């Protein structure tokens, strides 16, 4: 008879216990085993005994990949594998990959991939830090046999807000206007009632808003989010701002 199962938040600890019986005590014995799969490797341990002997075994194994950015450590690698690259996004788990999480730099190893087929790698958004918003949460790659391919994710790291923008006369900024950060690297479209969602914002900066070519069809917002109250530093906020 025996029992087995999985434990921990990501079910990355698998274990089993078995016990056997024989006539007049002959063949009596028991065994237990555990396998812990984590970000930086895999740890196995087993113990069994019978009438004549006791045995204990254990081991640790993992994989190391040197690439152009850093060295990434993970679980034992198959001949075909995937490198997740999400700079600055640490501790995020990968769906359907037991124990795989991004390291402190934002890299992770998916130890096994299917060659010459589409492999979809999806990050678990429930494990994202509060100050991170991903442009895409899943990527599809097609590796050749024996290759290591990269699944790269672009993250906006910073504050997340919904700005309710109004013009000088108090009317909302028109639907469809383009709101751009002063560095021009991030654009968002204004929705109903002058509201625009922005992620990865710095504490302060300038937002340029444009819905036409004339000077009357554009405005700008100077923001300083550190002066606004909120439930926590990186929680979602809804803030009213005048656009001049």
Task: Say what each PLM segment does.
Residues 1-178, 185-191, 197-244:
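Flexible, glycine-rich linker and terminal segments associated
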